Amino acid sequence: MKRFISIIVFAVLSVFVASAQNDTIKVLAIGNSFSEDAVEEHLSGLLRAEGLTVIIGNMYIGGCSIERHVKNLRGDIADYRYRKIDPQGTMQEINGYTLEKALADEDWDYVSVQQSSPLSGQPESYVLLPELVGFVRARIPEDAVMMFHQTWAYSEDSSHKAYVNYDRDQMKMYNAIVETVAA
């Protein structure tokens, strides 16, 4: 498992390093607590450790699903906490932000979207993903890269109430997520 994680981290860093041409890399996550952990903390730190200049944006709503993101974009609902980390690593948080406003804030190089963890292994919960991606794609530079942030399975001893969706079985949840995302 550690080898697999190392390969993934190397692959992700390689993509960002290859695209950095003595320029600032701008990454926007449209997500939830998983994007807070993975993008704000881990990716930001890894890129800075490589000596890269990076701006991280995170449109954050705890537990936010694709369905809720689409509801927010359709209604231009200012329901997000926009957390932005500047090139010096300083974070600013603004409450009451819309997707439209965040997408216009920078010429983003990378934009990730994700599903909420309870729904991440349920294929029927992704029916609105094309609408979310289309909305984002129409508002970012043509050469920007859209990414899907795959969530991870809960820990074996998780007390998360949605863990019952996977019979409280970490491998069952992991396999459901992988199969759903690959479809």
Model-derived features with residue positions:
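Positively charged n-region of N-terminal signal peptides that target proteins for export
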Residues: 1-4
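Residues in and immediately flanking transmembrane alpha helices
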Residues: 15-16, 45
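Conserved SGNH/GDSL esterase-like catalytic core that processes O-acyl groups on lipids
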Residues: 26-28, 37-129, 142
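Alpha-helical cap/lid subdomain in secreted, periplasmic
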Residues: 96-183
